[in-house]
Curated annotation (Swiss-Prot):
Belongs to the TPX2 family. The keyword Protease does not apply. This is Targeting protein for Xklp2. It is found in: Nucleus; Cytoplasm, Cytoskeleton, Spindle; Cytoplasm, Cytoskeleton, Spindle pole. One of its GO terms (cellular component) is nucleoplasm. Spindle assembly factor required for normal assembly of mitotic spindles. Required for normal assembly of microtubules during apoptosis. Required for chromatin and/or kinetochore dependent microtubule nucleation. Mediates AURKA localization to spindle microtubules. Activates AURKA by promoting its autophosphorylation at 'Thr-288' and protects this residue against dephosphorylation. TPX2 is inactivated upon binding to importin-alpha. The modification N6-acetyllysine is found at residues 128, 307, 375. Interacts with AURKA. Interacts with importin-alpha; leading to inactivate TPX2. Interacts with HNRNPU; this interaction recruits HNRNPU to spindle microtubules (MTs). Interacts with BCL2L10. Interacts with KIF11. One of its GO terms (molecular function) is protein kinase binding.
Length: 745
């Protein structure tokens, strides 16, 4: 796809035209030369592509080196013209040139009509200059539209033109406006635009691939739009600031969160440490009495004391705090001991005079008795007086009502009154045991028939197992697979992993007990009676020896103790208390009751009962009783044809049975074994490498330590203060004669 080779720079272009500098005195013919050049570039591009008709490209403004947004110097006066030009540039970027909508009409109207400033400016001369510039600009635009607009034949569109969704919405909103007004708006737009307005032709439906240069240009345009929007907001803010304080603008400012310390109720219960408690203030008790009146008069309030706002502050220290001089702890401790505590300082009257004193209105009062609290300290009397107790007893006597009982006539009869005798219960009647075994015996005896029935032969059904499968032939044993052995002698002695054949779990066969013959009587097997012999424990002798030693020790202790004499009390001879004489009863002769006799009688009774049971069983077995004939009522036996699949059929099977070669299984096992061995070997190598690295690090550390200790470091040469030879300031000694000689006297 052919593209026009255009150049661009990363920085914003500076070849722009400042429309504010244009005056009516300058040459108006060369004003639109820059726009003509850009239009010629676009026409050349269309001719290269082979389009004869005037065609407005989709990306003409994007490819052109057009400055869309520019920065103007700030002025105190409301410059409405700059705002209009910025709005036009923004709308040109957002809306294509071939798209004619209601927004373009609004822009053309706003461009033709001067916008009145919202607030009245102070500088009237600047406003007049601005109006003059706007009039000149309107005249230049009209001249450009007359000169540059060329007549062009409108080509009928080949297909129905598509209308964007935004355009449809705007047309629906403005549907109430007449069609004539829309035509007028379009004509004014074409006049205002000049050469940029070309009759719309439907563009060719082909996908436009944007190059990196075009994408960069679009990005640059978006950034310029953002800059223009920010400039517009800044100018609005500047206007509000210059207008002065008007109506307060409500701003949704979030309040700064103030930190509040936690206040737990449990902290008040904890007793504080004596160091943290408040300082003790010595107060004279007598001087405090009647100092404060019980009902103080409400005085007039003084002036409001100005206090600073409690705003949130950062914890960072300020410059003044940081610049404070450092005081050692020793000096602080010494100053603390020398300083007099605050409780011993007298109050300064000057400070008290500065504070606003509360004016107290003095009112004459009558003397009143003091409100003493001692009478409220007395406890309530809980003990009742005698009068209260007598009143309570009188109430109880009045509430009590006497009820007489009926007269018992037996009182007048002769003889003592005895309680009624309890009714005598009848003696217990013995009831025999109702055993279940006796019931069964009676039932059997009642069911017995007096006459023996004749024996009749009944045939039994043929066993079906003979027809279903082979009976009596053992199953074929599965021979294990042959383990191949290599003929190589080196491999014969190789240790092989023993292969364990998976033993199939054989189902547990429950064999039923054989049915006893009807003619043979049943004899229960009685278990042999074995008497357990009681053997003495092994430590009986040891216990006996301990008992003897204990008794011997007790006797020795008794011999060592000296017996103390204790006199018995004097007996009372008034009454003689003799023990009662015990009279022994006459011996009554009773027969012997030996255990052997009891056991013999019990055994004889059991033997007799057992014989009776055996005789009954023999009689029951001798009486043959045939079972009812149920075979004649059942369906005849029909052997079922077995439905075996082709895979299970040993002969002529079509499906191949799955099998697994022993070599494949051994190969898999070998691979797994080699994999495990390789993992173990890699782990060992990793461990050895880690140990080697640790040893190397230890050696390096040891060498560094030895070098640090062994290498001698010479101390630097000391620099002493230079000796300054100062000349003596004393005057020279003047020689004076001692005058020892007396010749000159």
């Amino acid at each position: 796809m052919s593209q026009v080779p255009t150049t661009y720079s990363f920085d914003a272009p500076t070849d722009f035209i400042n429309f504010s500098s244009l005056d009516a005195e300058e040459d108006t013919e060369n004003i639109d030369s820059w726009f003509d050049e850009k239009a010629n570039l676009e026409n050349k591009f269309l001719r290269q592509r082979g389009i004869g008709e005037p065609f407005q490209g989709k990306n003409s403004l994007r490819k052109a080196k057009l400055q869309q947004g520019f920065v103007t110097p700030l002025k105190a006066v409301d410059n409405t013209y700059h705002k209009e030009t910025e709005k036009e540039n923004l709308q040109k970027q957002s809306i294509p040139s071939n798209d004619c909508s209601s927004l373009d009409a609004k822009r053309a109207v706003s461009g033709n009509t001067p916008v009145q400033p919202q607030r009245r400016s102070i500088r009237l001369s600047a406003q007049k200059d601005l109006e003059q510039k706007e009039k000149n600009h309107v005249a230049s635009v009209e001249m450009k539209a007359k000169r540059c607009v060329a007549p062009a034949t409108d080509c009928p569109p080949q297909k129905r033109m598509k209308v964007s969704h935004k355009k449809k919405l705007e047309e629906e909103e403005e549907g109430s406006a007449p069609a004539t007004s829309r035509k007028n708006e379009r004509e004014t737009l074409e006049k205002a635009k000049g050469k940029h307005t070309v009759p719309g032709v439907p563009p060719a439906r082909e996908k436009v691939l944007k190059s990196t240069e075009e994408q960069e240009i679009e990005k640059r345009l978006r950034m310029q739009q953002e800059v223009v929007e920010l400039r517009r907001k800044n100018e609005e803010f500047k206007k509000l600031a210059l207008a002065g304080p008007g109506q307060p603008v409500k701003k949704s400012t979030s309040q700064v969160t103030k930190t509040v310390d936690f206040h737990f109720l449990t902290d008040e219960r904890i007793k504080q440490h004596p160091k943290n408690q408040e300082e003790y203030k010595e107060v004279n008790f007598m001087s405090e009495l009647r100092k404060h009146s019980s009902t103080p008069a409400r005085g007039t309030r003084g002036c409001t004391i100005i206090k600073p706002f409690n705003l949130s502050k950062g914890k960072k220290r300020t410059f003044d705090e940081a610049a404070s001089t450092y005081v050692p702890i020793a000096q602080q401790v010494e100053a603390f001991h020398k300083r007099t505590p605050n409780r011993y300082h007298l109050r300064n009257k000057k400070d008290e005079s500065l504070l606003p004193s509360k004016s107290v209105n003095k009112i004459a009062r009558d003397p009143q008795t003091p409100i003493l609290q001692t009478k409220y300290r007395t406890r309530a009397v809980t003990c009742k007086s005698t009068a209260e107790q007598e009143a309570e007893e009188l109430e109880k006597l009045q509430q009590y009502k006497f009820k007489a009982r009926e007269l018992d006539p037996r009182i007048f009869e002769s003889g003592p009154i005895l309680p009624k005798r309890a009714p005598v219960k009848p003696p217990t009647q013995p009831v025999g045991f109702d055993l279940e075994i006796e019931k069964r015996i009676h039932e059997r005896e009642s069911k017995k028939k007096t006459e023996d029935e004749q024996f009749e032969f009944h045939s039994r059904p043929c066993p079906t197992k003979i027809l279903e499968d082979v009976v009596g032939v053992p199953e074929k044993k599965v021979i294990p697979a042959t383990v191949p052995k290599s003929p190589v002698f080196a491999l014969k002695n190789r240790i092989r992993v023993p292969i364990k054949d998976e033993e199939e779990e054989k189902p547990v066969v429950i064999k039923a007990q054989p049915v006893p013959h009807y003619g043979v009587p049943y004899k229960p097997h009685i278990a042999e009676a074995r008497n357990v012999e009681v053997c003495p424990f092994s430590f009986d002798t040891r216990d006996k020896e301990r008992q003897l030693q204990k008794e011997k020790k007790i006797k020795e202790m008794q011999k060592g103790e000296v017996p103390k004499f204790k006199a018995l009390p004097v007996p009372h001879f008034d009454t003689i208390n003799l023990p009662e004489k015990k009279v022994k009863n006459v011996t009554q002769a009773e027969p012997f009751s030996l255990e052997t006799d009891k056991r013999g009688a019990y055994k004889a009774e059991m033997w007799k009962h057992q014989l009776e049971e055996e005789q009954k069983q023999q009689k029951d077995a001798a009486c043959f009783k045939a079972r009812p004939n149920t075979v004649i009522f059942q369906e005849p036996f029909v052997p079922k044809k077995e439905k075996k699949s082709l895979a299970e059929n040993p002969s002529g099977s079509l499906v191949q049975e799955p099998f697994q070669l022993a070599t494949e299984r051994r190969a898999k096992e070998r691979q797994e074994l080699e994999k495990k061995m390789a993992e173990v070997e890699a782990w060992k190598l990793q461990q050895l490498e880690e140990v080697r690295q640790q040893e190397e690090e230890q050696q390096k550390e040891e060498l560094a330590r030895l070098r640090k200790e062994l290498v001698h470091k010479a101390n630097p040469i000391r620099k002493y203060a230079a000796v300054e030879v100062k000349s003596s300031e004393l005057p020279l000694t003047v020689p004076v004669s001692p005058k020892f000689s007396t010749r000159f006297q």
